[in-house]
Amino acid sequence: MARRYDQRTTIFSPEGRVYQVEYAMTAIRHAGATVGILAKDGIVLAAEKKTTAKLLDSSTSISEKMFKIDEHVVCAVAGITSDANILINYARLSSQRFFYQYQEPMPVEQLVSQICDTKQGYTQYGGLRPFGVSFLYAGWDRHYGFQLYQSDPSGNFAGWKATSIGGENSQVAQSVLRSNYKPDISLKEALQLALKVLTKTMDRSNINSEKLEFSYFTKQGDNVVYHIFTAAELDAFIKETDLEQETEDN
């Protein structure tokens, strides 16, 4: 029965469902988990790497799942990366055009809304398919300070304190975040919580920098700083967190 209604994005099923959008969301669940946590002094983004081939030259790419849109906003993705690249380039262009016109950074929510308008358009017109990617946006502006947003293939978006996208165990990730998040969480505590979430959701032992990506977004004085952990930094952080956990357990 569903096959009668899933050939085009412009057709609703009798139950009010748009199957092509649901299929796009299924593609996201097959991707590695990505976590975003809003702290009082910044934002943490962390992700599970799916590409772990030994012959892959990782030096040709800074990050597999995290991208800088502008000086004041970055994003992490889960889903089809080639779809994400199109939207990221569009977001960069939109942000640059806004700055050229108004001589100030584009408000984070306005930028997210503009990207999501494009995503929503791909669910309404014939001959197109939805973007099979979900985003976490981390940004700062003078209007609302630090902000974390999530968007999905339907074009819907919302602000979050902590959330996760992708991964087969997304419900586990959300449960861990709900149980451990607190409003006054610091950046360091948010990094540790992100590691805890990914450790719970990943089906792998020996967690290390080959399987994870970590970054944080904060302010130093008047400057917005975005830092992606190097492999050495991430391995050191994982080791330090494990030692602290062992000390607490003892």
From Swiss-Prot:
<comment type="similarity">
    <text>Belongs to the peptidase T1A family.</text>
</comment>
<dbReference type="InterPro" id="IPR023332">
    <property type="entry name" value="Proteasome_alpha-type"/>
</dbReference>
<dbReference type="InterPro" id="IPR000426">
    <property type="entry name" value="Proteasome_asu_N"/>
</dbReference>
<dbReference type="Pfam" id="PF10584">
    <property type="entry name" value="Proteasome_A_N"/>
</dbReference>
<dbReference type="InterPro" id="IPR050115">
    <property type="entry name" value="Proteasome_alpha"/>
</dbReference>
<dbReference type="GO" id="GO:0019773">
    <property type="term" value="C:proteasome core complex, alpha-subunit complex"/>
</dbReference>
<dbReference type="InterPro" id="IPR001353">
    <property type="entry name" value="Proteasome_sua/b"/>
</dbReference>
<comment type="subunit">
    <text>The 26S proteasome consists of a 20S proteasome core and two 19S regulatory subunits. The 20S proteasome core is composed of 28 subunits that are arranged in four stacked rings, resulting in a barrel-shaped structure. The two end rings are each formed by seven alpha subunits, and the two central rings are each formed by seven beta subunits. The catalytic chamber with the active sites is on the inside of the barrel.</text>
</comment>
<keyword id="KW-0963">Cytoplasm</keyword>
<dbReference type="GO" id="GO:0043161">
    <property type="term" value="P:proteasome-mediated ubiquitin-dependent protein catabolic process"/>
</dbReference>
<dbReference type="Pfam" id="PF00227">
    <property type="entry name" value="Proteasome"/>
</dbReference>
<protein>
    <recommendedName>
        <fullName>Proteasome subunit alpha type-4</fullName>
    </recommendedName>
</protein>
<dbReference type="GO" id="GO:0005829">
    <property type="term" value="C:cytosol"/>
</dbReference>
<dbReference type="InterPro" id="IPR029055">
    <property type="entry name" value="Ntn_hydrolases_N"/>
</dbReference>
<keyword id="KW-0647">Proteasome</keyword>
<dbReference type="GO" id="GO:0005737">
    <property type="term" value="C:cytoplasm"/>
</dbReference>
<comment type="function">
    <text>The proteasome is a multicatalytic proteinase complex which is characterized by its ability to cleave peptides with Arg, Phe, Tyr, Leu, and Glu adjacent to the leaving group at neutral or slightly basic pH. The proteasome has an ATP-dependent proteolytic activity.</text>
</comment>
<keyword id="KW-0539">Nucleus</keyword>
<dbReference type="GO" id="GO:0005634">
    <property type="term" value="C:nucleus"/>
</dbReference>
<dbReference type="InterPro" id="IPR016050">
    <property type="entry name" value="Proteasome_bsu_CS"/>
</dbReference>
<dbReference type="GO" id="GO:0010498">
    <property type="term" value="P:proteasomal protein catabolic process"/>
</dbReference>
